């Protein structure tokens, strides 16, 4: 059976509080899933909706991952914060990729560290 998953990648340089980080990750998970193909979304749901949260050092890393994911045909969602609490308005916080086949996502995120 083919495994499906979703990855959410956070920026380590922002040093967000746990609560703020949880909200940003949730935004990315929902938004990226909305862009996924119907078949990827259904397969992911049937497989338990696996999610993996990873990290990068800085904003440029998120942009590079988004471009790599686009080239692989993966759905993505780059999340920008409204700036009402901890960080400046318009700050890009996280990137959601997938859901999609795990082997496709691993081509893009396989070298990243877990949060």
From Swiss-Prot:
Q: Which domain of life is it from?
A: Archaea
List the GO molecular function terms: peptidyl-tRNA hydrolase activity
| Signal peptide segment | none
Cellular component, GO annotation: cytosol
Main localization of the protein? Answer: cytoplasm
What is one Gene Ontology biological process annotated in the Swiss-Prot or TrEMBL record? translation
SUPFAM superfamilies referenced in this protein's UniProt entry, alphabetically: Peptidyl-tRNA hydrolase II
Q: Where in the cell is it found?
A: Cytoplasm
Catalysed reaction(s) here are: an N-acyl-L-alpha-aminoacyl-tRNA + H2O = an N-acyl-L-amino acid + a tRNA + H(+)
Q: Which cysteines are joined by disulfide bonds?
A: none
Q: What does this chain do?
A: The natural substrate for this enzyme may be peptidyl-tRNAs which drop off the ribosome during protein synthesis.
**What is the official name of this protein in its record?**
Peptidyl-tRNA hydrolase
Protein's organism: Methanococcoides burtonii (strain DSM 6242 / NBRC 107633 / OCM 468 / ACE-M)
């Amino acid at each position: 059976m083919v495994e499906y998953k979703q990855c959410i990648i956070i920026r380590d340089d922002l040093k967000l509080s746990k609560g703020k980080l949880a909200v940003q990750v949730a935004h990315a998970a929902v938004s990226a899933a909305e862009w996924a193909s119907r078949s990827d979304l259904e397969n992911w749901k049937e497989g338990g909706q696996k999610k993996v949260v990873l990290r990068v050092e800085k904003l440029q890393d998120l942009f590079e991952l988004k471009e790599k994911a686009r080239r692989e045909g993966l759905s993505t969602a780059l999340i920008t914060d409204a700036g009402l609490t901890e960080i400046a308005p318009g700050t890009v916080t996280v990137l959601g990729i997938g859901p999609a086949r795990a082997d496709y996502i691993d081509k893009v995120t396989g070298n990243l560290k877990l949060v």
